[in-house]
Amino acid sequence: MFYCTGEGILWISPDDRLIVSRLPAGTYTDVGQEYRRLALRPCTPSATPAFFLDTPEMRMVRREVEAFFDPAATARLQAVGLRHRRGIILHGPPGTGKRTMMRQLIPFLVERDAVILVDCDADYLEHALIPAIRASDPDRPIVLLFDAFDRDVSLSRAKLLQLLDGLTSPDHLLMIGCTNDFNAIPVQLRNRPSRFGLILRIDRLPDGVHERLAEQKYPTLSPADRQFAVRLTRNLPINFLERVCEMFLAGCDPDEISDRFRAIAPAESTDGHERR
């Protein structure tokens, strides 16, 4: 049971506010520390148009998520006494599209009536948030998204282990975590198929992604400016392309952008060789 404030905050403890017996499908974040009580806030959709990746890795992730919502698969698990849970870890260097892939799943998850909880404390999840969601809706699918999974593991390792694979861990639970440092995740957490059925390393963005992103996200730039930005950042994480495009939007010319770019880019040239 939840109690809604005029600002859209959802308390878990009883209150004299509007009662919300069933959370609408959508994305929520824990704001309990801000309000000193257990509470959720709906996440505001980004005003930036989503950039959709269509890669073999994205299709693998999509199939794994679709399998979680397959009623036949759920029934088979229940028939043999297994909990309905799946876990996915996306790892690799920064700027290779891991978090873009995770965000790209959100519309599909909402269509499947899921409650999506972003970067929530593991102890709150098992002992307060998930029970409150399930109180009036015991089979509701819940999806946990962790933007920096290695950080969350370092803060609450034992709690995450309990949440994922403990005797009281919740049913109908999908967890997706992203990390730039896979080795920071303990072996006992990642080496259990019951916890993470898909662990996927993403080393680089496929060819053509920089061009498509520049065209889709920055349509007001001239083709020449977009091509310049793509050439300058082709072998670098996608956030460098965005920085260069934003410099063009701010009125910088190519020479000025090149000078600024040398100060912010890693020690690697656009042809893949280390700068001297």
What positions do the PLM features span?
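AAA+ P-loop ATPase mechanoenzymes
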Residues: 1-95, 101-113, 121, 265, ...
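C-terminal alpha-helical "lid" subdomain
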Residues: 2-26, 192-194, 198-276
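Conserved phosphate/pyrophosphate-binding and hydrolysis machinery centered on Walker-type P-loop NTPases
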Residues: 51-55, 179, 231-237
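Walker A/P-loop NTP-binding motif of AAA+ ATPase domains
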Residues: 56-62, 66-227
